[in-house]
């Protein structure tokens, strides 16, 4: 499979210089006179597969966008194996610039033809890194000064970040062969070289969001009292210093101190800073919303109410999100282990040779965690504990670190896989450690509104019923009733189930390279929590939250997650 019509490939002809005259071949233009063998590497992205969904395949692929498939340079290492098939320090290849790739175009596809001169024919292991990091370039260009070959040094190397993933920058996506590549170089015919195909994959992963409802607005029905405030509106108040603020959740009431004239009550926070306003005929700017004036002192009042059947048709608009536990490091080449976490290997496929898990540089340490009430800043950025403690109510403030605006249109990918929320790195722990404190998850913030989507302001929950005023709470449940406060009508939904292969006995809640994890919220059964409250050692406490996943790999392996709250 070509990535976006580009053959991510390089025809690397290795002219093996012979030691005897018997190996001399006809000398054509630009051909070496003495060769042991010629090798052509055809390097491309993995082709599509019709296999059933598993830890390597998902049933769906996506070509990605242009910047995710561009090749600017490469490191190719060929390590000559000894008679026992072991790596040696006899290596060829190295760092190749764009110019050194000798770019050509054939049938609309880009092909690269770099040349190498090798000393011997025989068996070689091949490691291909497209768009390598500076540290990998340094290894490739260095003199051999350690006990390990360049092949081993690069394959065992890792990349670490604090959030700005440079190996996922446009035109700089690092890609590495997924399988161990061995080739027996035999041909000494320049026109008919030994050919070996190499599949490469991106080292990073991607989390996307598909918009299921226009403007991310979801209808739902909530339980409430048998009466409800008859009218709620929004408007503007102008402070004495001319600062204008928008007030939501202004409830219409009778002013009992002034012949039952209309007054609008704003609950404030927890009902402790209630204020009363008078609606004027003036409107604010181009909004069409009325300007309100403050009424002091605060009057005795009685809400206008209407009878209900104990239910209200409301909406939840998802407006913010925060990804949690984004891994800060990844190996350059695939690292894998079996179910026991005792036998490790570099390069290969899950499900082959008893390989059960991918491995990231922090996997072993995460597997040893017993105290989950930590931020784990050495493993993650956007660590769950830090996001959990964040003050989200002012998420639009410049000081807000974790929460971002949830997209309302697919503007950076496509309709199938949605809008990219983030590129990320592998995050893998053994099955029994796949708990919220250690797996990658997501928190959504919702804005509660009436059936039209208009915010209802601060609301209250008591005995699984929802109220728009504290008076209604106490009238229905007694003066001493305890309740949850949804400040400004905000609620929160959390899921730790960004799954790789849902229900798998190993790679269930995991992030794996070259996969797109597509999140789609299909609906709600209830309003989320008033605050972000997550048990780091257990599952979500919201029993109305459901998550489903299907998946697929290369060019990007797409794994769909349908979420119902």
Residue ranges and their predicted role:
Residues 2-6, 18-565:
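Sec-type signal peptide cleavage vicinity
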Residues 13-16:
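Bacterial Sec-type N-terminal signal peptides, specifically the leucine/valine-rich hydrophobic h-region
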């Amino acid at each position: 499979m070509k990535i976006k019509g580009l053959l991510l490939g390089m025809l690397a002809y290795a002219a093996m210089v012979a030691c005897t005259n018997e190996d001399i071949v006809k000398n054509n233009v630009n051909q070496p006179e003495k060769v042991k063998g010629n090798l052509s590497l055809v390097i491309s992205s993995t082709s599509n597969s019709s296999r059933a969904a598993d830890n390597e395949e998902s049933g769906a692929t996506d070509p990605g966008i242009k910047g995710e498939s561009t090749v600017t340079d490469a490191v190719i290492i060929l390590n000559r194996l000894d008679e026992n098939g072991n790596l040696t320090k006899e290596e060829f290849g190295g760092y190749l610039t764009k110019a050194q790739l000798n770019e050509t175009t054939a049938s609309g596809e880009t092909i690269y033809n770099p040349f190498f001169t090798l000393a011997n024919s025989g068996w070689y292991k091949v490691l291909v890194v497209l768009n390598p990091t500076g540290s990998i370039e340094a290894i490739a260009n260095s003199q051999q000064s350690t006990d390990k070959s360049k092949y081993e040094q690069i394959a065992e190397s890792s990349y670490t970040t604090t959030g700005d993933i440079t190996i996922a920058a446009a035109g700089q996506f690092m890609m590495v062969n997924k399988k161990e590549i061995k080739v027996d170089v035999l041909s000494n015919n320049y026109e008919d070289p030994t050919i070996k195909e190499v599949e490469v994959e991106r080292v990073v992963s991607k989390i996307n969001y598909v918009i299921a409802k226009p403007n991310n607005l979801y209808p739902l029905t909530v339980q409430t009292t048998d009466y409800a405030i008859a009218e709620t509106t929004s408007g503007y108040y102008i402070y004495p210093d001319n600062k204008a603020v928008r007030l939501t959740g202004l409830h219409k009431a009778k002013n009992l101190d002034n012949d039952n004239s209309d007054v609008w009550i704003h609950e404030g926070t927890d009902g402790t800073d209630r204020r009363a306003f008078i609606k004027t005929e003036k409107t604010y700017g181009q909004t069409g919303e009325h300007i309100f004036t403050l009424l002091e002192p605060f009057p005795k009042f009685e809400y206008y109410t209407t009878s209900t059947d104990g239910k209200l048709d409301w909406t939840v608009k998802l407006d913010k999100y925060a990804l949690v536990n984004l891994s800060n490091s990844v190996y350059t080449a695939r690292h894998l282990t079996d179910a026991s976490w005792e036998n490790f290997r570099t390069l290969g496929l899950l499900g082959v040779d008893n390989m059960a898990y991918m491995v990231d540089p922090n996997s072993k340490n995460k597997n040893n965690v017993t105290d989950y009430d930590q931020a784990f800043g050495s493993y993650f950025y956007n660590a769950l504990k830090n996001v959990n403690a964040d003050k989200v109510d002012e998420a639009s403030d410049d000081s807000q670190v974790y929460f971002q605006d949830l997209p309302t249109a697919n503007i950076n990918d496509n309709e199938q896989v949605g809008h990219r929320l983030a590129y990320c790195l592998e995050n893998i722990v053994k099955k029994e450690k796949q708990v919220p404190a250690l797996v990658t998850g997501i928190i959504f913030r919702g804005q509660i509104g009436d059936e039209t989507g208009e915010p209802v302001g601060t609301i209250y929950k008591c005995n699984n019923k929802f109220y728009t005023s504290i008076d209604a709470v106490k009238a229905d449940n007694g003066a001493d009733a305890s309740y949850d406060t949804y400040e400004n009508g905000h609620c929160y939904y959390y899921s730790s189930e960004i799954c790789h292969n849902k229900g798998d006995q190993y790679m269930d809640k995991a992030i794996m390279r070259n996969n797109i994890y597509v999140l789609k919220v299909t609906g709600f059964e209830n309003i989320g929590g008033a605050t972000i409250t997550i048990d780091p050692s257990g599952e979500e406490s919201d029993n109305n939250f459901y998550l489903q996943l299907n998946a697929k790999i290369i060019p990007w392996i797409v794994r769909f997650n349908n979420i119902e709250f």
